[in-house]
């Protein structure tokens, strides 16, 4: 079973790009507080697809609190002769837990289209 739920704050603004004529992907970095005396946070990349990607771009900005439900995906690539690996959350749902960015409209919850 590959299921993840996380709550945190956006550590970056949302960036959206078209990956084909029919699909868009939004990416942002989620800062998730560590439950320890030392504190700190883990910074996890999040990918959101299609209609929800557009909603995230419209309503979210750095610093806002969100809840994310989705799955983990690992990626590997070569960079300067070295093998690199990254793990990201592919979101099925993003819940906006703090108000929308200024001028964006009412707080809303969006379900992601099953893409990615």
Regions found by a protein language model. Give the residues of each.
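Beta-rich strand-turn-strand
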Residues: 49-83
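Short aromatic-glycine-enriched beta-strand elements
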Residues: 17-32, 85-86
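OB-fold and OB-like beta-barrel modules that bind single-stranded nucleic acids
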Residues: 5-12, 30, 62-73, 91-94
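The conserved catalytic core of RNA pseudouridine synthases
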Residues: 38-48
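Acidic, gly/ser/pro-rich intrinsically disordered tails
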Residues: 1-2, 14-22, 37-39, 54, ...
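C-terminal structural segments of small proteins and small subunits
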Residues: 75-100
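Short beta-turn/strand-loop junction motif enriched in small, turn-promoting residues
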Residues: 12-16, 33-35, 53, 73-77
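Residue-level recognition of specific faces of alpha-helices
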Residues: 3, 27-29, 45, 86, ...
